[in-house]
């Protein structure tokens, strides 16, 4: 049975990990054993934070909508209830964008929500 030499595959594996750790400080960027752990942890953080990003952006949109709606003399929860009643199907991302970029258009939507609540 011939002997297996692993130099080529080991070097390729090490190069791949060190390349992924490019830019890391200290031994995390150039020592394989430590770089491997750092890259794995970075991957875990990336996986976790891709999911957290969705929560964070939703919270940001809600904060922006709430601020814009309070300028119109209404609270966020009442506004959302009014939108549901008026059957206006705009998501929070679009509403937040309107609140920032098109104040007149957003004010019209708020008026529709108020009208639906009073009717």
From Swiss-Prot:
Entry keyword set: Ribonucleoprotein, Ribosomal protein, RNA-binding, rRNA-binding
InterPro entries tied to this protein: Ribosomal_bL20, RIBOSOMAL_L20_CS, Ribosomal_protein_bL20_C
PROSITE patterns cross-referenced by the UniProt entry: RIBOSOMAL_L20
Gene Ontology biological-process entries: ribosomal large subunit assembly; translation
Keyword DNA-binding applies: no
Keyword Iron-sulfur: no
GO CC annotation terms, alphabetical: ribonucleoprotein complex; ribosome
A molecular function GO annotation: rRNA binding
Function as written in the Swiss-Prot or TrEMBL entry: Binds directly to 23S ribosomal RNA and is necessary for the in vitro assembly process of the 50S ribosomal subunit. It is not involved in the protein synthesizing functions of that subunit.
Matches recorded under PANTHER family: 39S RIBOSOMAL PROTEIN L20
Family listed: Belongs to the bacterial ribosomal protein bL20 family.
Protein's name in the database: Large ribosomal subunit protein bL20
């Amino acid at each position: 049975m011939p002997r297996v030499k692993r130099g080529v595959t080991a070097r390729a594996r090490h190069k791949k990990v060190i390349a992924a750790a490019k830019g890391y400080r200290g031994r995390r960027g150039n020592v394989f054993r430590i770089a491997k752990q750092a890259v794995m942890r970075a991957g875990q953080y990336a996986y976790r934070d891709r999911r957290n990003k969705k929560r964070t952006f939703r919270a940001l949109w809600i904060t922006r909508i709430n601020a814009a709606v309070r300028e119109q003399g209404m609270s966020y929860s009442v506004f959302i209830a009014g939108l549901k009643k008026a059957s206006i199907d705009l998501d929070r991302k679009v509403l937040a964008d309107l609140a920032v970029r098109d104040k007149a258009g957003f004010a019209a939507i708020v008026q529709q929500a108020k009208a639906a609540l009073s009717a």
